[in-house]
Design a protein with these regions (language model features):
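Transmembrane helix-loop-helix hairpins at the membrane interface
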Residues: 1-30, 46-57, 62-66, 71-82, ...
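Alpha-helical transmembrane segments in multi-pass membrane proteins
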Residues: 2-5, 54-100, 122-195
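Intrinsically disordered, low-complexity acidic/Q/S/K-rich activation/interaction tracts characteristic
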Residues: 6, 10-15, 44, 116-119, ...
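Membrane-water interface of transmembrane alpha-helices
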Residues: 11-20, 93-115, 186-197
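Interfacial transmembrane-helix boundary/kink motif in multi-pass membrane proteins
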Residues: 25-42, 81-91, 111-140, 161-178, ...
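Transmembrane alpha-helix boundary signature
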Residues: 51-54, 107-113, 146-147
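Intrinsic disorder/low-complexity segments enriched in polar/charged and small flexible residues
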Residues: 94-97, 177, 208, 356, ...
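Helix N-terminus capping/helix-initiation residues
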Residues: 104-108, 196, 211, 259, ...
Length: 390
């Protein structure tokens, strides 16, 4: 619920920016820019403190009260590894905040307007750029933590890592995040502030027309691309998958274990939320390439690997569907792409549960037909090797 409230708050800020842009007096836009500058200055100071203040005594205190199920020594090692990434996170936070403050000046926005279709004079477009920076910041935060988690797994003892991840991975949490994306998209395009519900749906590409040609082409292309990257990754870099496979199993195992509900959540929630926000709201302003790059960036929970290449390719495919058809067609293609492989995971195959990314080995007691499964390192199963997007 917290992430839903946070995303909705950003959407409301963009809605107020729509009102400020419609005022004849520019003082409202200046006031909005001043508030944004103050907020980003606070964020920059917090990042600087995180980068320079030592956190030596925290692992003992946090590990003692975490109740993660691991032995105290392993829990302490886990938190030492996680906290070791905080200076990097602080540095990223500081520099992202500096970039955001610079974007409050007219000339950087005018330069960007030559690359992407934004209006450098509109406050709402400035906030949209800041929203993109927030996505980059949280993605960097996730990437650094994932690298720390992988180092723990490589040491051979998860130290309560599985408990820590599983407690934050629920069907309800995934739906809350994706519904937050929907709320952010609608408020971001000015629902109730600058557009009626019908106008907002039209702006987001929620139109009745449905292109079966683009739908089927996107699903087939996405699945084919996923299998191709999986084969290449298995053959060229098999060792790089081991830790990500284990981490992915921890992330998605609790959702997959819920059966059909989990499969539908993985399939439908991301199709609804991610397509509405990225292809519906962002793409008309940021363009296909920049939006697809942002889409790949938010999936850094899989680490910096070939997974991101596959996610970028899938994003470009869905972006073309949005451009040539509409968002609902892209949404259906995304949901189908996810659902195919989420269902395969539920019924027992060894399944890459990401946009063409790492294989999630399903535990033996989940497998319906374990004899039909081929090791992801040994090769691709003859019938199917599913992938799905979280």
């Amino acid at each position: 619920m917290g992430i839903f409230i946070g995303l909705t708050f950003i959407g409301l800020a963009m809605g107020l920016a729509h009102i400020a842009d419609r005022q004849a007096d520019a003082v409202w836009r200046y006031l909005g820019s001043f508030v944004l500058a103050a907020l980003w200055l606070i964020i920059a100071l917090c990042g600087m403190m995180l980068a320079v203040v030592p956190l030596v005594d925290l692992p003992d205190n946090i590990a003692a009260g975490a109740n993660l199920g691991g032995d105290p020594g392993s829990n302490q090692a886990l938190f030492e590894s996680l906290l070791s990434s905080f200076p990097k996170i602080g540095a990223w936070t500081f520099w992202v905040a500096i970039v955001a403050i610079l974007l409050l000046l007219p000339w950087p926005r005018r330069l960007l307007a030559r690359l992407i279709p934004i209006d450098p004079e509109r406050l709402v477009h400035t906030i949209a750029l800041h929203g993109a920076l927030v996505l980059v910041l949280f993605s960097a935060f996730t990437a650094f933590l994932v690298q720390s988690m992988l180092s723990v797994l490589e040491a051979g003892d998860d130290g309560g890592l599985q408990t820590l991840i599983e407690d934050g991975t629920t069907v309800g949490g995934l739906w809350a995040q994706q519904l937050g994306f929907v709320a952010l998209a609608f408020l971001g395009v000015g629902l109730f502030f600058a557009r009626t519900p019908v106008e907002a749906m039209r702006r987001l590409g929620w139109t009745r027309a449905f292109s079966w040609r683009w739908y089927l082409g996107a699903v087939a292309s996405g699945v084919g691309m996923a299998l191709l990257v999986q084969v290449v990754w298995n053959r060229l870099l098999p060792d790089s998958q081991a830790g990500i496979e284990q981490l992915s199993e921890m992330m998605f195992g609790p959702i997959v274990k819920t059966g059909l509900v989990g499969a539908l959540t993985i399939g439908l929630a991301a199709g609804l939320g991610e397509e509405t926000l990225f292809r519906g709201a962002m793409q008309p302003r940021f363009g296909i390439v920049f939006t697809s790059m942002l889409f790949a960036v938010i999936h850094t929970q899989y680490g910096v690997s070939l997974a991101l290449v596959q996610i970028l390719a899938i994003a470009l495919i869905f972006g073309l569907v949005r451009q040539r058809a509409n968002t609902l067609t892209a949404m259906a293609a995304h949901a189908t792409y996810n659902l195919i492989f989420a269902l395969a995971a539920v019924i027992g195959s060894q399944t890459p549960l990401w946009h063409g990314g790492p294989v999630v080995p399903i535990p033996e007691d989940w497998k319906a037909t374990p004899t039909a499964v081929v090791s992801p390192v040994d090769g691709i199963p003859p019938a199917m090797t599913p992938t799905a997007a979280p």
